[in-house]
Amino acid sequence: RFFGGDLMVAVGGTMVKHYKELAYMGFIPVLLHLRTIFANMKRCKEDIVAWQPDVVILVDYPGFNLSIAKFLRAKTHIPVYYYISPKIWAWKEYRIKNIKRDVDELFSILPFEVEFFEDKHHYPIHYVGNPTVDEVTLFRAEHPETFDGFVRENNLDSKPIIALLAGSRKQEIKDNLPHMIR
């Protein structure tokens, strides 16, 4: 049972809410959808309490999930595991106190986060590998000609190659890409 996306649907279980109905980027979209955000938060909390799982695994999305973790710690005895740790090393580092208080186990896909959480904040974290890196490594092993061919075909042998990463969500790309390509 989960609030999630297409990949979670593919492996089974019951989807309560698709993440596309939960994620809003930017000040104005969040403001315009505040009622929906709070309704989704309430529904999630009620669903967890009604279902009483043995553990809740939160995945990424700290704006929503840290609130769920806080609720679970205050109102239930359900253990909270957090996969893809909040990027507090990039911003909102103060959230470490909430993580320490509300999260039982933290799992990271970035190896440097182990040192950040354990050495700097004395909070244990499990590095579990990075599925994106694994996929890229596998793809490149199966298709070694792809990148080399691209470089050769576009005469980029001696030129720097720049990755333009506008975001992972449609709204981020829509908002960021026009500014990035100027």
List each model region and its residues:
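Charged active-site motifs of nucleotide-sugar-dependent glycosyltransferases
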Residues: 156-163
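Short acidic-capped amphipathic helix/loop micro-motif used as an active-site/signal-coupling element
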Residues: 178-181
